[in-house]
Amino acid sequence: MPDYRSKTSTQGRNMAGARALWRATGMKDEDFKKPIIAIANSFTQFVPGHVHLKDLGQLVAREIERAGGVAKEFNTIAVDDGIAMGHDGMLYSLPSREIIADAVEYMVNAHCADAIVCISNCDKITPGMLMAALRLNIPVIFVSGGPMEAGKTKLASHGLDLVDAMVIAADSTASDEKVAEYERSACPTCGSCSGMFTANSMNCLTEALGLALPGNGSTLATHSDREQLFLTAGRTIVELCKRYYGENDESVLPRSIANFKAFENAMMLDIAMGGSTNTILHLLAAAQEGEVAFDLRDIDRLSRKVPQLCKVAPNIQNYHMEDVHRAGGIFSILGSLARGGLLHTDLPTVHSRSMEEAIAKWDITQTDDEAVHTFFKAGPAGIPTQTAFSQSTRWETLDDDRENGCIRSFEHAYSQEGGLAVLYGNIALDGCVVKTAGVDESIHVFEGTAKIFESQDSAVRGILADEVKAGDIVIIRYEGPKGGPGMQEMLYPTSYLKSKGLGKACALLTDGRFSGGTSGLSIGHASPEAAAGGAIGLVRDGDKVLIDIPNRSINLLVSDEELAERRVEQDKKGWKPAEVRPRKVTTALKAYALLATSADKGAVRNKAMLEGL
């Protein structure tokens, strides 16, 4: 049987000093024989997805202690991508993922914790904690803060979200009064932004990976049902500790649960629900931490056979996360994938012996359990609040319409090809990604003229100054993990293209990335990035570029000989932006850039550079 890791600091005469300090935290004699369970919280008043988490760590702690464990809470940082967007603050967003992963490792290993409850929610926090969990490989369970309710206003016929506020603000025909109304209505409650953006996508994927409870990704932050997820997480982590430390059951460890097949399940879910392209970046990073040989080629392979079964904002206006929950949540999508013969159902989860068992219990189309049906009727109250579990509104009926509803069957899929795709070509030899769920079918094949911008800032200025015309392909480069540094999100350029009426008339290609709120022909993660010698750095104004989503290709229509000549010329100049950027790159950002890999590797640290240290 494996010993408790905490035994290192709680047992033996020589640990009298450590025990004295543990006692100062409130531990008693009997506690030194119990598992010490770390609660990694991410409360902050900066982020609406985390503003309500302050007391939830202690809610979990009390449940852990009732079940026989010792709970010790700590906090990580959390960056709000929406607030950090559009200025140099976005340089810090992706690097914060690595800081969060390191912070969890530091706290858990420094104090020899036996297990972890990860209380996450927004864009980089769930991925960072996931990376740490797979790095540490001790019992873990994820429970997120939950999605925000969609906004409501009499000025719109559909639910609102953050992207609506951004688009209307850039629309010169909209009145100041309308902009103000959208601003006040778009984000009405605590929780992660209400569409299938990065935060909600990642929280849904933790269900598919088997590391979170059913409902984790879709139960509203404001709904009282979400409290039960936190309480159950506290009890479950103690049970996982008993199984591992008491019964030597390694099947409960994160690397046993989130193995290669589980990553395939998560990616198939992602493709089926049209998740954020950021999820590709984060799944690749997490797989590397778990030593899982899952890469961009696997994602490309899966994207060709998984249909799109769910469509949510920003890919469609009339559905948000509250509607996904009403339609049965993630386990209904997983159930559809299983019936289609795609899902690996023999895998364990933190709550069930197998995914097959979990689907049978939680898929509303398979179970008659009234408690499960009631759970998925949890809906929005439409009352602005920053308080968790503050309402108990329920829909009168479930959305079990698999022909025309939010979640579809294979036979009635939104499209037979899924919502994410990987493209390859001479402009991105190692690949780039596009959220096809947000691309109008009329522009799945698009040939356009390159319009070069050496930064997101210059692209925004160019778009707002009407320098971009129909038929252009906006190229934003030197915004990758190393070149930015930090791989900024390009939500403002894509939103402004939409507000200028160019959403279906232009494309955008970048070695940066996109917010989960992005839609349109927006292609990111071009690898290698420009700063690493990628061909995106060789494109010139006026070049023709051909994008062919059905054939998964993207090519600069320039001869190999011409590209070779340009490469020789660029090698002499150095792979740097052609224009000076007024950008303060601090020591912290330089340290990140020094080790950063391109997006096809998940933008993780280049471990080869650390070998021998």
UniProtKB/Swiss-Prot annotation:
Family: Belongs to the IlvD/Edd family.
GO molecular function: 2 iron, 2 sulfur cluster binding; dihydroxy-acid dehydratase activity; magnesium ion binding
The entry's keywords: 2Fe-2S, Amino-acid biosynthesis, Branched-chain amino acid biosynthesis, Iron, Iron-sulfur, Lyase, Magnesium, Metal-binding
Gene Ontology biological process: isoleucine biosynthetic process; L-valine biosynthetic process
Name of the protein in its database record: Dihydroxy-acid dehydratase
Pathway listed: Amino-acid biosynthesis; L-isoleucine biosynthesis; L-isoleucine from 2-oxobutanoate: step 3/4; Amino-acid biosynthesis; L-valine biosynthesis; L-valine from pyruvate: step 3/4
Subunit structure as annotated in this protein's UniProt entry: Homodimer.
Organism in which the protein naturally occurs: Pseudomonas putida (strain ATCC 700007 / DSM 6899 / JCM 31910 / BCRC 17059 / LMG 24140 / F1)
